[in-house]
Amino acid sequence: MNKVKVGIVGCLGRQGRHLVSEISASDIAEVSAGLVRIGSEYVGKVLGVVIGCNCDAKITDSLEHLFDVSDVVIEFTNPNTMIECMKMAELKKKPMVSGTTGISEDMVFQDYIKSVPFLWSANLSFSMNILLKLVEDATRMLSGYDVEIWEIHHRYKKDSPSGTSLMLGKAAARGMNVQFRMNQYIKGGQESRQDNKSIGYAVSRGGVGLSDHKIIFAGDEDVIEFSHRATNKNVYAKGALKAALWLIGQPCGIYTMSDMMVTQ
């Protein structure tokens, strides 16, 4: 059986390296090529040699070539690169998975990609997406509780709050049956909560490998907490590969991890 060929955009990034290693260990998928910035010193080199894993794919700086040699493409980059990838996916009629965060709330994926399957999630961890469902259900049952979301990420994390924290907030808002609106409260009581339909955020940055999220339901007599801690970026790589393999068999459309999970 031929292996599914997976192209990786941002193959030498923090997440990209984990993706290369995860896919290279798969029995049903292989890395077709890895994309780096134009003019990079790594263009033409063997990806496995650079990263240190069993991967024979070459590194390229041509987005078009990457799509040409791939059955499906995965990207963890930045919003601008993500848009270019969506345009190329549409042109080449190839499915694409994106885990890029920091995108505008106003972005409409259908403006760029219409005729191929596309899956986006701010967090591709299977367990985090289970937590999102638990949060929505808990919020629905805990009417009258204040909702606060806390996160800590490595010092290099650019978006704040993280895409995952926003997903948690939106899950809570669905449970409240209200329009999502983000409120960030300043520590020390300088800003007061207006009602228990609002969602507070607290953000911390530090270290190099941290990724913790906690959602707190604070009532008058008790406090309930849900938390998720990613101890290794492989959890996102595993989710991304699972999503990519699933996406290949889907009709054109915009998908989330929730869509995939209901079919498992």
From Swiss-Prot:
Please state the pathway this protein functions in, per its UniProt record: Amino-acid biosynthesis; L-lysine biosynthesis via DAP pathway; (S)-tetrahydrodipicolinate from L-aspartate: step 4/4
Kinase in keyword set? no
One function term, GO molecular function aspect: NADP binding
Name its species: Ehrlichia ruminantium (strain Gardel)
Q: Which residues are recorded as binding (S)-2,3,4,5-tetrahydrodipicolinate?
A: 154, 163-164
Please give an example of a GO cellular component term from this record.
cytoplasm
HAMAP family annotated for this entry?
Answer: DapB (MF_00102)
UniProt binding sites for NAD(+): 10-15, 99-101, 121-124
EC assignment: the record states: 1.17.1.8
User: NCBIfam families, per this entry?
Assistant: dapB (TIGR00036)
Family per record: Belongs to the DapB family.
The protein's name is 4-hydroxy-tetrahydrodipicolinate reductase
Assign the protein's first listed, main location to one coarse class: cytoplasm
Catalytic residues?
153 (proton donor/acceptor), 157 (proton donor)
Q: Which Gene3D superfamilies match?
A: Dihydrodipicolinate Reductase, domain 2, NAD(P)-binding Rossmann-like Domain
Q: Which reaction does it catalyse?
A: (S)-2,3,4,5-tetrahydrodipicolinate + NAD(+) + H2O = (2S,4S)-4-hydroxy-2,3,4,5-tetrahydrodipicolinate + NADH + H(+); (S)-2,3,4,5-tetrahydrodipicolinate + NADP(+) + H2O = (2S,4S)-4-hydroxy-2,3,4,5-tetrahydrodipicolinate + NADPH + H(+)
Keyword Cytoplasm set for record = yes
The protein's location, in the record's own words, is: Cytoplasm
Its domain of life reads Bacteria
For this entry, list what GO says about its biological process. diaminopimelate biosynthetic process; lysine biosynthetic process via diaminopimelate
Which controlled-vocabulary keywords does the entry list?
Amino-acid biosynthesis, Cytoplasm, Diaminopimelate biosynthesis, Lysine biosynthesis, NAD, NADP, Oxidoreductase
Q: What does this protein do?
A: Catalyzes the conversion of 4-hydroxy-tetrahydrodipicolinate (HTPA) to tetrahydrodipicolinate.
Q: Where does NADP(+) bind?
A: 37
